[in-house]
């Protein structure tokens, strides 16, 4: 749970910085922001905040196995059989949702197969979203929205 909160705070810190203007985005509809930042509708981190929060919520629900029957005892982290080295033949595309919970991707990978992220296991869509968030040390990517992988909403 603490890891999820830290990831959320990290993403919120990145969203508070605003989006840097790049040559690839010039000429699109712009909305002026404070401190001289220019926001292109739908692509700046502030406008993507709802999407980021959605994926973090999916990450949290998937990690706790919400909507699944649970044995008594402490909460266990959940991952599909493929992520645990099991057979992919029985692997469903989505986990069943209970009482209005969001349908979240159930495909998990370890960060070593995508991008080093302190050894966390994250949904593939979350990893793709994190790859497109720039920091002051890395240039903003040319493509702002990640292309959804199969099984992502």
UniProtKB/Swiss-Prot annotation:
<feature type="disulfide bond">
    <location>
        <begin position="39"/>
        <end position="44"/>
    </location>
</feature>
<protein>
    <recommendedName>
        <fullName>Putative adrenomedullin-5-like protein</fullName>
    </recommendedName>
</protein>
<keyword id="KW-1015">Disulfide bond</keyword>
<dbReference type="GO" id="GO:0010460">
    <property type="term" value="P:positive regulation of heart rate"/>
</dbReference>
<comment type="function">
    <text>Probable non-functional remnant of adrenomedullin-5.</text>
</comment>
<dbReference type="GO" id="GO:0007189">
    <property type="term" value="P:adenylate cyclase-activating G protein-coupled receptor signaling pathway"/>
</dbReference>
<dbReference type="GO" id="GO:0003073">
    <property type="term" value="P:regulation of systemic arterial blood pressure"/>
</dbReference>
<dbReference type="GO" id="GO:0005576">
    <property type="term" value="C:extracellular region"/>
</dbReference>
<keyword id="KW-0732">Signal</keyword>
<comment type="similarity">
    <text>Belongs to the adrenomedullin family.</text>
</comment>
<feature type="signal peptide">
    <location>
        <begin position="1"/>
        <end position="18"/>
    </location>
</feature>
<keyword id="KW-0964">Secreted</keyword>
<dbReference type="InterPro" id="IPR051665">
    <property type="entry name" value="Adrenomedullin-reg_peptide"/>
</dbReference>
